[in-house]
Amino acid sequence: MTYFVLFLGLCFVLGGLAVASNPSPYYGVVGLVVASVAGCGWLLSLGVSFVSLVLFMVYLGGMLVVFVYSVSLAADPFPEAWGDWRVVGYGAGFVLVLVVGGVVGGLVEFWHPGVITVDSGGMFSVRLDFSGVAMFYSCGVGMFLVAGWGLLLTLFVVLELVRGLSRGAIRAV
């Protein structure tokens, strides 16, 4: 189980790296799906299946809509692939920044290779998922308001970008 959780963590980091290097929106969607599935699987292994399911539905549902808009706007006849030198350079630069930041910040010294799962506590482990909805609405009200405001702002930004030059502030002279 530990190796599987570490594999999910590696897939999460590689999926995030694939989204961050962003050679083309076509390939960014693949990285987004890999990172989302791996992250939700990681949360599932920690015992928070309700949070994992909610994040999976909301994140993939919302972000794939944004990627569909960006794919429809960026109609490249020859999109850049992950094998291009520029994209490989971006990926290597991101990995280098992560490694240097970990060494300088001292995170490498405190990292222990063990992963604690939900079943490691024996019979008396309390699963965090039993109070999932109650915790969302009691302790997470402020975060819900911030996330809702951010999603509303993102919706208006995407709608403004998709609208184009029809009635926007940028006009032809």
From Swiss-Prot:
Which family does this protein fall into? Belongs to the complex I subunit 6 family.
A Gene Ontology CC term for this entry? mitochondrial membrane
Q: In terms of domain of life, where is this protein from?
A: Eukaryota
Q: Which gene encodes it?
A: MT-ND6
Species source reads Larus canus
- Kindly list the residue ranges recorded as spanning the membrane: 1-21, 27-47, 48-68, 87-107, 139-159
The EC number(s) attached to this protein equal 7.1.1.2
Q: What does this protein do?
A: Core subunit of the mitochondrial membrane respiratory chain NADH dehydrogenase (Complex I) that is believed to belong to the minimal assembly required for catalysis. Complex I functions in the transfer of electrons from NADH to the respiratory chain. The immediate electron acceptor for the enzyme is believed to be ubiquinone.
Where does it reside? Answer: Mitochondrion membrane
Q: Which UniProt keywords apply?
A: Electron transport, Membrane, Mitochondrion, NAD, Respiratory chain, Translocase, Transmembrane, Transmembrane helix, Transport, Ubiquinone
Which InterPro entries is this protein grouped with? ComplexI_Subunit6, NADH_UbQ/plastoQ_OxRdtase_su6, Nuo/plastoQ_OxRdtase_6_NuoJ
* Membrane-protein topology: Multi-pass membrane protein
The protein depicted here goes by the name NADH-ubiquinone oxidoreductase chain 6
What GO molecular-function term can you cite, just one? NADH dehydrogenase (ubiquinone) activity
Catalytic activity annotation: a ubiquinone + NADH + 5 H(+)(in) = a ubiquinol + NAD(+) + 4 H(+)(out)
